[in-house]
Amino acid sequence: MNNLSFSELCCLFCCPPCPGKIASKLAFLPPDPTYTLMCDESGSRWTLHLSERADWQYSSREKDAIECFMTRTSKGNRIACMFVRCSPNAKYTLLFSHGNAVDLGQMSSFYIGLGSRINCNIFSYDYSGYGASSGKPTEKNLYADIEAAWLALRTRYGIRPENVIIYGQSIGTVPSVDLAARYESAAVILHSPLTSGMRVAFPDTKKTYCFDAFPNIDKISKITSPVLIIHGTEDEVIDFSHGLALFERCQRPVEPLWVEGAGHNDVELYGQYLERLKQFVSQELVNL
């Protein structure tokens, strides 16, 4: 998320904008697309083509594990979706909402590595205005985007809610919390989450104002699924206190992972990240 200048902060106090204005200032940094999707003549099969800016070029076997397609949201945008079959015997599929400055091309290699290590398939999507998705990134579009992804995951692949783990990272925790507050799933994982947009910009904010954006703090108590929160103690973008505050409001919290010394973008580089996910998916969920 962007740091606000002094003049922008003054403007925010004196002339409070609508939530959409806060959202666009704080949250959305879509990169130049790192991939394209090409449709065949039948209109039913899409092929992923990665640019040189993507983090990793795939082997044929790895590319065969990735299926991409487009789906339409309730707001009329077409969003790119990606299903990564990481494990033939996976019980769970992660519905993964990524961070604010990446797209599916950049994240896809991470999905392959993560899914194969925790024995889960991964379904992800690009927000409106990201990657091959049409439209513009807004808070309302975030909610419509994940709703369309959830519907596609359930109808196209026949995956039941009890086999879906809703996973959000950074700004991706916003649509994830919104969806999880409305639909029950196997579990919810919130990675470097924020409480609200105003609380990121103004750390001393104690309540949610009508012009606030991304009010996770007011929605998380509505989640009835188990919630695992992961946060770095030295997060320089979304302070560690956000993770703590959300944890305290959960109906069904599980043991959180506070990664000592980790920042905002390196939590997954610490060994305890994978260890905690493996334990949660393979052991704890069975008994919850």
Curated annotation (Swiss-Prot):
Palmitoylated on cysteine residues located in a cysteine cluster at the N-terminus which promotes membrane localization. Palmitoylation is required for post-synaptic localization and for depalmitoylating activity towards DLG4/PSD95. The active site is at residues 170, 235, 264. Its main location: membrane. Inhibited by palmostatin-B. GO terms for cellular component: dendritic spine; endosome membrane; glutamatergic synapse; membrane; plasma membrane; postsynaptic density membrane; postsynaptic recycling endosome membrane; recycling endosome membrane. SUPFAM superfamilies: alpha/beta-Hydrolases. Pfam families: Hydrolase_4 (PF12146). The keyword RNA-binding does not apply. The modification Phosphoserine is found at residue 282. Its EC number is 3.1.2.22. It is a lipid-anchor. Keywords: Cell membrane, Cell projection, Endosome, Hydrolase, Lipoprotein, Membrane, Palmitate, Phosphoprotein, Postsynaptic cell membrane, Synapse. It catalyses: S-hexadecanoyl-L-cysteinyl-[protein] + H2O = L-cysteinyl-[protein] + hexadecanoate + H(+). InterPro entries: AB_hydrolase_fold, Hydrolase_4. One of its GO terms (molecular function) is palmitoyl-(protein) hydrolase activity. GO terms for biological process: negative regulation of protein localization to microtubule; positive regulation of protein localization to endosome; protein depalmitoylation; regulation of dendritic spine maintenance; regulation of postsynapse organization; regulation of protein localization to synapse. It is found in: Cell membrane; Recycling endosome membrane; Cell projection, Dendritic spine; Postsynaptic density membrane. Hydrolyzes fatty acids from S-acylated cysteine residues in proteins. Has depalmitoylating activity towards DLG4/PSD95. Has depalmitoylating activity towards GAP43. Has depalmitoylating activity towards MAP6. Has depalmitoylating activity towards NRAS. Belongs to the AB hydrolase superfamily. ABHD17 family. This is Alpha/beta hydrolase domain-containing protein 17B. It comes from Homo sapiens.
